[in-house]
Amino acid sequence: MILRSFGQKISPLTKKHPISLKKFIYFFIAFNIAALSNGYSETTKETYKQLSIFNEVFNRVKERYVEEVTDKELIEKALNGMLNALDPHSSFMSEDLFKEMQIDTAGAFGGLGIEITMEQGFIKIISPIDDTPAQKAGVESGDFITHLDGQSVVGLSIREAVDIMRGEVGKPITITIVRGMKEPFDIVLKRAIIKIQSVKHKVIDDIGVLRVTTFNEQTTTGLKKIIKELESGETDIKGYVLDLRNNPGGLLDESISVSDLFLEKGEIVSVRGRDKQDVQVYSAKKGDIIKGKPLVVLINQGSASASEIVAGALQDHNRAPILGITSFGKGSVQTIVPIDSGAIRLTIAKYYTPSGDSIQAIGIEPDVVVPQAEIKVLNELFTFRESDYQDALTNETKDPNAKEEEVKNLIDDDYQLFRAIDAVKTLATVQK
């Protein structure tokens, strides 16, 4: 989860008198060592002692490491090591990486199309992004990447891994995947320009299916536009499915805005930092964009962060039942702090659902557990017919079995979505 704070202004002092990272650290260490004899507390003295150790290690590495390394490389790696050791989502970003991140949240960038985290030294895939090389090649949420072009990923930071995976458009990269207990296998992906369409939609049997792939600057606006078009169109939309599967999250304020679209009142999420007194509560404003029509939310193990905020808020207010399987469980908030020569991505808080629960490392539990599966044997037993639904539409110019065939195909292709649509229809019938 990212707070949209990378637009902060750099202080006038920093603008007029930029200090290089190297000079600042040398000055800081020298100052601290000199302060050891000036009557500071034991805790402060211990801190200064550790900084002097850093200085010694830095110089030894410079003098004796097998390959020549620059001061900039060493300092950036030291900063990254410090932040990565805190949690997998904190990191130091060089100036170039900071610019890339700003492009990411705007909705277009180059790469493979996966959202990742680090776990036990390996790259863990939170989710593949729709219509990208990774998704088309069959990469799945929960996969681990152990090697990139034959090189182990152990020891890499997230940003270093991302940097390797990005590159010239069309240039292939081989990723080694571990999936469950199976043997590792290689997938060759060609890098592409990743243009994220954060909101997609389709209408299936008078149910609006709203697919949200990420929470970027375009999400709420796109969702509003689609819903207004559907509500004013010729089809009488009976209800909606909000599909958040394999949505890795994004911007906090967008997740709040999306939740607010479907709620009349009440808390959406609270954000709590280290200071227990410092609690930010975000609440809904009056106005349900679909005016109380049935809504069902779909989640899976690739639904993370902002997706979990939306699912948790709608679940706790009984606005929508949640279908699918338990979500990813990323309940932390990161902020981007611009500094000279880059930025710091730092975990500053955890978020809590309206019921007061943290989903960190636990996730959102669905109300109805529906694993994704290829339903083959069960198809023979299904007695579902389009004509069984109340107010089923007819069309004199088309095959009367067309919708029935569409639903049958949906059972095979996406059983979770089929169940969600069925649930919306049931809720719509109950409301009448």
What is each residue range found by the language model?
Residues 340-349:
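Short acidic, Pro/Gly- and aromatic-enriched capping/linker segments at domain boundaries
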Residues 65-126, 172-174, 178-188, 196-198, ...:
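Extended, small/polar residue-biased N-terminal targeting/export presequences
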Residues 1-21:
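N-terminal secretory signal peptides that target proteins for export/translocation
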Residues 26-35:
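Bacterial N-terminal signal peptides
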Residues 350, 355-432:
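Conserved functional hotspot residues or short segments at active or partner-binding sites
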Residues 40-50, 54-71, 124-128, 132-141, ...:
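Cleft-lining beta-strand/loop regions that shape enzyme active-site pockets
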Residues 43-58, 62-64, 70, 87-113, ...:
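Glycine-biased strand-turn-strand hairpin within the trypsin-fold
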Residues 37-41, 356:
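Short linear recognition/processing motifs and adjacent strand/loop elements at protein termini
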